[in-house]
């Protein structure tokens, strides 16, 4: 959404790793090599640093993060939030208390994701407070209970 703002109209980032410099070194170095600073001050990691291009946002963006995420810490998303605010961009932020990295299958997050796309892609208002329930006969139906 930041690199192709005229193409992407709606996006959702859940527990996003927005800058490999703020993540585990072994992951970043595996895919981008050792951090190198160029003579112009840019680095080989800049192309993966969303906060550097957040000002380009044009569409609707929902950022979601678990407050107890110990894989990709919430400050990774807050880097982008800070730059969106500086650029006076509208966006939506959902912080899920006491959730770790794997909240994406929780019924609430699934509903919020669906609602966001219905609202901003379909242009319709989703049913208010729709509750995803397990299928008859038990089971979770693929949805995780709240943590």
Protein language model features and the residues they cover:
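Active-site-proximal cap/loop segments of hydrolase catalytic domains
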Residues: 1-147
């Amino acid at each position: 959404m930041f690199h192709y703002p005229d193409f992407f109209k709606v996006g959702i980032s859940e527990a996003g790793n927005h800058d490999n410099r703020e993540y585990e070194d072994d992951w970043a170095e595996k895919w981008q090599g050792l951090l190198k600073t160029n003579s112009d001050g840019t680095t080989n990691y800049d192309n993966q640093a969303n906060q550097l291009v957040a000002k380009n946002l044009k569409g609707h963006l929902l950022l979601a993060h678990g407050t107890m995420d110990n894989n990709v810490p919430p400050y990774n998303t807050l880097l982008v939030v800070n730059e969106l605010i500086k650029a006076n961009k509208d966006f939506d932020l959902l912080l899920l208390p006491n959730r770790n990295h794997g909240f994406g299958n929780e019924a609430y997050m699934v509903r919020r994701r669906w609602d966001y796309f219905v609202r901003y892609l379909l242009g319709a208002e989703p049913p208010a407070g729709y509750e995803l329930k397990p299928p008859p006969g038990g089971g979770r139906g693929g949805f995780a209970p709240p943590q």
